[in-house]
Amino acid sequence: MVKESIPKEGENIKIQSYKHDGNIHRVWSETTILKGTEHVIIGGNDHTLVTESDGRTWITREPAIVYFHSEYWFNVICMFREDGIYYYCNLSSPFACDEEALKYIDYDLDIKVYPNGKYHLLDEDEYEQHMNQMNYPHDIDIILRRNVDILQQWIEQKKGPFAPDFIKVWKERYKKIRDY
């Protein structure tokens, strides 16, 4: 990643998700950067336009904090709903940034975490199907399986974006930047 392409705090960026074959998967039109370093990007968004690969659009329903790390093969969306905080974790390539957007490859597997701390691994069938269709290399499969384990450990240990202080700090920072 080029250092100049790291987004700065307060900057609004697009997030583009791709599939392994290079096709666009999903685009979030606007996310406000709360922290941008070469290793970690934290952003916030609320009622953001999302465009699917088939052109369909929808708008996110609630405020969310997004977490990307350059060394892990996952990203995390922390969604603030009336009944608590939900997490949607995408198994994905580490992020890359350029002038156009923050970008990553979505590898189908997801983990949904509920406010009570319980979680479920989702879309294993889709992962198997796409692994065969798009010829995911064996090394990628090993990396992704290892990162599922890491992600589950983080969830259980309340580490990284799952730590209560993480949510408090970044939700407050997003509110300040947004209301400024």
Curated annotation (Swiss-Prot):
Cofactor: Mg(2+)
The keyword Metal-binding appears for this protein: yes
Annotated SUPFAM superfamilies: FomD-like (SSF159234)
Superkingdom per UniProt: Bacteria
EC number, as in UniProt: 3.6.1.15, 3.6.1.6
InterPro entries, alphabetized: DUF402, FomD-like_sf, Ntdp-like, SA1684
Residues involved in Mg(2+) 2 binding: 108, 110, 123, 126
Catalytic residue positions: 26 (proton donor)
UniProt keyword annotations, A-Z: Hydrolase, Magnesium, Metal-binding
Keyword tRNA processing: no
Binding residues annotated for Mg(2+) 1, in chain numbering: 90, 106, 110
GO molecular function terms listed in the Swiss-Prot or TrEMBL record: magnesium ion binding; nucleoside diphosphate phosphatase activity; ribonucleoside triphosphate phosphatase activity
Catalytic activity entry: a ribonucleoside 5'-triphosphate + H2O = a ribonucleoside 5'-diphosphate + phosphate + H(+); a ribonucleoside 5'-diphosphate + H2O = a ribonucleoside 5'-phosphate + phosphate + H(+)
Job of this protein: Has nucleoside phosphatase activity towards nucleoside triphosphates and nucleoside diphosphates.
PANTHER family documented for this protein: PTHR39159, UPF0374 PROTEIN YGAC
Protein family (similarity comment): Belongs to the Ntdp family.
The protein, known as: Nucleoside triphosphate/diphosphate phosphatase
Species in which this protein is naturally found: Staphylococcus epidermidis (strain ATCC 35984 / DSM 28319 / BCRC 17069 / CCUG 31568 / BM 3577 / RP62A)
